[in-house]
A protein has these predicted regions:
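A glycine-rich, Thr/Ser-enriched phosphate-binding loop motif common to dinucleotide/cofactor-binding enzymes
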Residues: 1-9
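A charged, well-structured terminal subsegment
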Residues: 154-168
Length: 173
């Protein structure tokens, strides 16, 4: 439901038919599961958006979730011209490093420095967020932060899915 809410939010705020959406890895003190990045990537790949995934080497997502996304290991390059920035931490996926933290590089924290190279991008995160680790206060408190409307869209996404499930169950009665 979270990634569906994210899609609804992008649809509400996009200024072009094909926005550039960047999902960026960000540091976190604990290794987090890949569920949110994987489902976000699935929804983005189902759209006609320009979708870029950026992370340090070693944090690759499974190919079935990466899909047609461009993978860029240089975060600043990935952010160039972006319309939406979606920040999320995830643990390493492959090999002997599965589930581990390979980097706590604070240069990957989303800050004004990275946002300056975007197309005045909106900042997104599924919340709760580790301030000044995933994203700086300046970014999450900026007018370009849409984390609150994004969170509110969880109710809409849940309502849509529940309605559809109920409609399907009524068909079988």
């Amino acid at each position: 439901l979270q990634s569906f809410a994210d899609l609804i939010t992008i649809e509400e705020y996009k200024k072009t038919a094909r926005p550039k959406v960047v999902m960026t890895w960000a540091p976190h003190p604990r290794p987090l599961p890949q569920a949110v990045p994987n489902s976000f990537a699935e929804w983005m790949n189902a759209t006609d958006y320009e979708f870029v995934i950026t992370h340090p080497e070693g944090y690759e997502l499974a190919p079935q979730f990466v899909g047609n996304a461009k993978v860029e290991y240089d975060q600043m390059k990935a952010f160039e011209g972006a319309d939406f920035i979606y920040a999320k931490n995830w643990a390493a996926y492959s090999g002997d490093n599965y589930g581990q933290i390979l980097s706590k590089d604070r240069d990957w924290t989303v800050s004004d420095r990275q946002m300056a190279v975007t197309n005045n991008a909106y900042f997104m995160h599924c919340l709760p967020v580790r301030r000044n680790m995933i994203v700086t206060d300046d970014v999450i408190e900026s007018p370009q932060s849409i984390v609150i409307p994004e969170a509110a869209n969880r109710e809409i996404s849940a309502t849509v899915v529940l309605k559809r499930l109920l409609e399907l169950s009524l068909i079988h009665i």
